[in-house]
Amino acid sequence: GFFYVAWVIRKLALAEKIHPAAAVSAVPVAVVTGSHEQYAVIMTLLLVLSGVYLWKAHRRPGNAVLFWTLAVIDVVSLLVIALCPGNAGRNAVSIADLPVYATFGFGQKLYLGLLSIERVFIANADIVFFLVVLIWTWLVWEKTKDYRRTFPSALPLLILFGQTVLRTAYPGLSGLFVMPGEILEWSWSDLSTWIPMVYLAVTVAAMIYALYQLFGDDLFTFISVLLLVGCGFGAGMVLGFMATIYVSGERVYAPLYGILLAAL
């Protein structure tokens, strides 16, 4: 559903003609897709960026009625989600099972959210993330033909390879690679607390660098892709502010999967 709605919004932004059947089917698909809070936020960003793009190009969307229909669906979806107690209910149940979570402050919850991205999505050598970074690195090389400009784009791959080999060769070091769903307390002075954050910082910096090499010639496109990828990472990071992080697994990274694949 996300890919279909994104495809329709893209055609609207490019003022391309949309088949009547595609336009009609986009409405129920947008309703279903927008019922998920993370996808609703991403739809909002896509519509806003499309509106800015159309405004900059001084033209109307390919189908103005469909564009505004999708916008109304998105706004209504966000309002319904904001008034829906579903997430609050699930969070309350999780806190009842893990009362220690209620004692966590802002910094601890932020750390859990960042850790969940680095440990669950990246450090597990997720195939989507691996392929995306591999293709980005190859595209940077194809564009620049300069290994010195390509090497920084490959840093996430080197990190993945290095720590995977390390964990496989030395199981005793597994304590340095904890998963957020396996810890209820940690010490800010421990090395294992900060290694994932360093990996995450280097990975994000390398991804931004790769995107700049690929899209830096068009500032609007670069910022748009950067915002979308950031929105995907944020969808995973915000989970740290809910006790459901201990039971959600990789389900919450579906939006980031979609964004990374769409960016290709």
Residue map of PLM features:
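Eukaryote-skewed repeat-based solenoidal scaffolds used as protein-protein interaction platforms
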Residues: Y4-R10, V32-S35, V238-L239
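Specific aromatic-rich, kink-prone transmembrane helix
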Residues: G1-L14, V48, V52-Y53, I259-A263
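Transmembrane catalytic cores of multi-pass membrane glycosyltransferases
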Residues: E37-L45, V52-F215, T221-L226, G232-V252
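C-terminal amphipathic "assembly/sorting" segment characterized by alternating charged
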Residues: V247-L264
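Short hydrophobic alpha-helices at membrane interfaces in multi-pass membrane enzymes
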Residues: I9-A30, V65-W68
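Membrane-interface alpha helices of multi-pass inner-membrane proteins
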Residues: P20-E37, M43, V48, L79
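Carbohydrate-recognition beta-sandwich/jelly-roll modules
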Residues: G1, V31-T33, A57
